């Protein structure tokens, strides 16, 4: 008889991961759809939108901020935003542990209120280093959402793939909102308002979440429920490695594009469209269309073998990125839309792998470890974006991204197939 066991704060990440990877398909939870009130589900999805919006305000407003702070080129100010992306990744580890062991509801309250206050503080910056400090604070609170909010959302989901897809749509509508809302706020009220308005909205969401989300009971990490059947060690390590490596390369593409697309479109639409607000509207349209891909992919994940679907979407990124590298004007708009559809469409897969293989008791911690590595490394994209574009131009950047997509495809080929997982579960470790 296996004794009951409650994970302790001293439990190592490796031990936690090895104890919970399970060979089942995306699980179907027996809880009813009413376990999370609809208002709570909406607020969790809004939280994802706010998370991505906040982390990209700076990239959208960088031209205006650079001019006020006396920088001749926007590229020279971009490295000051790297702290936000670094903590966006590194902060996922403590956020995930606290989510499992303290509780996901209280951590989401810290997320909403902390993000709002950090944005208000950033709006007061009087120079580049104060701005960098404020952005880093935003990154620290933004780190909470992915390892806490998404596991909380799928904890009781009957169709996890569909839930992840819809949540991904919400997150990337936040990306679109960063392009659209920030563009209009910068033009009409100044860049400081681009931080103040979403900051107040986040605080309001925190108040609503505190009132509408009921207590969640015992934190998942302290549950005495026996762990699921584990994968053999070889497949376990393959799944973890692929999950992390693919997340790194995917995050690099996401950061390069979402942080650089505004200035990219300004450059490639020169002489066609000069209005920054209209550029922001076009970019928001690109992101809105691309976000719909996550809903479609999320539903397909529940029906199609994960490896085959993932590989197809990654391979589709390459030709679109190559076309965007050489496109101009409206042809560029078409190519960029295709590229972003495929980049956004690949996002649900790492979360789907966590739901598929990882027991809920440590799901936030495993997600936090994965995010710390992927976001931590991919934060280099923010630091490199300005210097690379300044030295070599956007054409070189998009060719580099096509190469990164090719690397992702090579990594995904190593992902265990559903058949291999089933056979391993039936026959033990090979």
Put a short name on every predicted segment.
Residues 61-89, 274-281:
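Extracellular/periplasmic helix-loop-helix junction of adjacent transmembrane segments
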Residues 301-350:
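C-terminal transmembrane helical hairpin of 12-TM major facilitator-type secondary transporters
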Residues 90-126, 301-304:
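Conserved MFS/SLC helix-loop-helix module at the cytosolic interface between two early adjacent transmembrane helices
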Residues 134-172:
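Cytoplasmic helix-loop-helix junction between adjacent transmembrane helices
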Residues 167-214:
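Helix-loop-helix hairpin linking two adjacent transmembrane segments in secondary transporters
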Residues 357, 361-394:
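A late C-terminal transmembrane helix in Major Facilitator Superfamily
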Residues 58-59, 238-292:
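Extracytoplasmic gate region of multi-pass secondary transporters
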Residues 82-96, 284-296:
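Central cavity-lining transmembrane alpha-helices of secondary-active solute carriers
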């Amino acid at each position: 008889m296996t004794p009951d066991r409650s994970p302790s704060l001293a439990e190592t990440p490796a031990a936690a991961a090895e104890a919970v990877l399970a060979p089942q398909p995306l699980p179907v939870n027996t809880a009813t759809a009413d376990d999370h009130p609809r208002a709570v589900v909406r607020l969790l999805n809004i939280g994802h939108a706010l998370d991505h919006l906040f982390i990209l305000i700076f990239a959208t407003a960088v031209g205006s901020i650079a001019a006020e702070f006396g920088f001749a080129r926007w590229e020279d100010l971009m490295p000051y935003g790297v702290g936000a992306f670094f903590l966006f990744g590194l902060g996922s580890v403590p956020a995930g542990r606290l989510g499992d062991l303290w509780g996901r509801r209280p951590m989401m309250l810290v997320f909403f209120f902390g993000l709002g206050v950090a944005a208000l503080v950033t709006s007061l910056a009087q120079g580049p280093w104060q701005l960098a400090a404020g952005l880093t604070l935003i990154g620290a609170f933004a780190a909470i959402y992915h390892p806490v909010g998404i596991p909380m959302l799928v904890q009781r989901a009957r169709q996890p793939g569909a839930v992840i897809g819809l949540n991904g749509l919400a997150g990337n509508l936040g990306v679109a909102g960063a392009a659209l809302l920030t563009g209009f706020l910068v033009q009409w009220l100044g860049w400081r308002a681009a931080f103040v308005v979403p900051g107040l909205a986040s605080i309001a969401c925190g108040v609503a979440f505190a009132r509408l989300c009921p207590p969640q009971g015992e934190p998942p990490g302290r549950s005495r429920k026996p762990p699921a059947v584990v994968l053999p060690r070889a497949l376990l390590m393959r799944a973890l490695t692929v999950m992390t490596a693919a997340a790194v390369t995917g995050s690099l593409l996401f950061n390069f594009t979402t942080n650089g697309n505004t200035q990219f479109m300004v450059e490639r639409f020169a002489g066609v469209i000069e209005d920054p607000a209209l550029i922001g509207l076009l970019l928001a349209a690109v992101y809105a269309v691309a976000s719909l891909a996550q809903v479609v992919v999320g539903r397909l994940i529940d029906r199609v073998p994960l490896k085959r679907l993932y590989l197809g979407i990654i391979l589709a990124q390459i030709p679109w990125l190559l076309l965007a590298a050489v496109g101009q004007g409206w042809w560029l708009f078409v190519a960029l839309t295709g590229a972003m559809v495929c980049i956004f469409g690949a996002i649900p897969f790492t979360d789907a792998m966590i739901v598929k293989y990882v027991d809920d008791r440590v799901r936030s911690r495993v997600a936090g470890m994965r995010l710390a590595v992927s976001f931590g490394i991919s934060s280099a994209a923010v630091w490199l974006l300005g210097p690379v574009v300044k030295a070599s131009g956007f054409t070189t950047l998009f060719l580099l991204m096509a190469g990164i997509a090719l690397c992702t495809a090579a990594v995904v080929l190593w992902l265990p197939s559903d058949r291999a997982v089933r056979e391993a579960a039936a026959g033990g470790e090979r």
